Amino acid sequence: MERKDRGKLFRMYVTEQFVQSIHMTTQDRRITKTRKAIYQAFLHLLNEKDYDIITVQEIIDRADVGRSTFYSHYESKELLLDELCQKLFHHLFERDDQLSPQDYLTHIFQHFKKNQDHVTSLLLSKNDYFIRQLKKELEHDVYPMVAKKLIQSHPNIPHSYLKHLVVTNFIETLTWWLKKGKTYTEQEVIQFYLEILNVASN
């Protein structure tokens, strides 16, 4: 094959790859836009009603997409809930090592308050999946911060019970505050919580 022909084939190959990359970029944008529309529709519906009574058809109608389009992105509304939990908890439980337990727990309360439009209904309705995921995060990130003092203060109490106490009390405290305790600041409520656990800093 002559050099001229090889050069022509190379230019054709480069052109084809460029066209394909543009097509993929456009397709990726379309996919991202569609997923965002579905996700936002889901959030808006959570602002209006409990998760359990939201239907896939309502999400489809609100997002203005076809049924086949919805199912090409999400197999069920449960996967939407899973994505919500992942996005929420990823930021929620990020921790700066310089933060004290009080400041870290205050950050969690503030984040729930900031996202309460689509989170409060899940929390207050005690959605099973949401609560299970929240408990896992609290066990992993919150309990270790207070475990040492608790175990020292209550050496005869099983660690599993202490962990259960920390996690369930946190959820109940957060629920109480979101429902009827907002006359108190996040910092004040966290102080109540830590004092009840007897691990507050002096």
Where are these regions (language model features)?
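Helical hydrophobic small-molecule/effector-binding pocket
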Residues: S100-V146
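Amphipathic alpha-helical linker/stalk segments
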Residues: H44-E48, I54, L84-I108, V119-S121
